[in-house]
């Protein structure tokens, strides 16, 4: 199956993505991460109002194969979390870049936050180098 990496997103090497719209960031996990994890069974996310710091774990996702920490690509305050994904994490795989988003965050410094992220092209190249996808 050909994995999708939308061009309008930025990616982390830890496989989270970000869609930045002004000062609001939508955060989720990439189709590649979902494929590697397999069937998702548990998702832990911060509460609305919690602060996130780029590079510090904000939650975790578990599958039948593994458990992984989640890392925010930006610093800011959680303004929404996808309750449907917490209740039924297995459906994240159905639409990871649309309905499968995890958090919405009000970003502190939108102009500076994307500095260490990857374009879709660079993310795919990283994966091809590591995994030969």
From Swiss-Prot:
Q: Which UniProt keywords apply?
A: Lipoyl
Q: Name one GO cellular component term.
A: cytosol
Record text on cofactor binding = Binds 1 lipoyl cofactor covalently.
**Record flagged with keyword S-adenosyl-L-methionine:** no
Cofactor(s) essential for the protein: (R)-lipoate
Residues bearing the modification N6-lipoyllysine: 65
Classification via InterPro entries:
2-oxoA_DH_lipoyl-BS (IPR003016), Biotin_lipoyl (IPR000089), GCV_H (IPR002930), GCV_H/Fam206 (IPR033753), GCV_H_sub (IPR017453), Single_hybrid_motif (IPR011053)
How does this polypeptide assemble, per the annotation?
The glycine cleavage system is composed of four proteins: P, T, L and H.
Q: What does this protein do?
A: The glycine cleavage system catalyzes the degradation of glycine. The H protein shuttles the methylamine group of glycine from the P protein to the T protein.
Family matches, as NCBIfam families: gcvH, PRK01202.1
Q: What is this protein called?
A: Glycine cleavage system H protein
In its UniProt entry, the species of origin is given as Crocosphaera subtropica (strain ATCC 51142 / BH68)
Its organism's taxonomic lineage begins at: Bacteria, Bacillati, Cyanobacteriota, Cyanophyceae, Oscillatoriophycideae
């Amino acid at each position: 199956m050909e994995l999708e990496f939308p061009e309008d997103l930025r990616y982390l090497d830890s496989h989270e993505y970000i869609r930045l719209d002004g000062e609001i960031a939508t955060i989720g996990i990439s189709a590649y991460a979902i494929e590697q994890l397999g069937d998702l069974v548990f998702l832990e996310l911060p509460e609305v109002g919690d602060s996130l710091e780029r590079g510090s774990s904000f939650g975790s996702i578990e599958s039948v194969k593994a458990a992984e920490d989640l890392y925010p690509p930006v610093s800011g305050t959680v303004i929404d979390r996808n309750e449907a994904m917490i209740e039924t994490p297995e459906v994240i795989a159905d639409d990871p870049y649309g309905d499968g988003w995890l958090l919405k965050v009000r970003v502190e410094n939108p102009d500076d936050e994307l500095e260490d992220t990857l374009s879709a092209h660079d993310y795919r190249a990283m994966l091809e180098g590591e995994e030969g996808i």
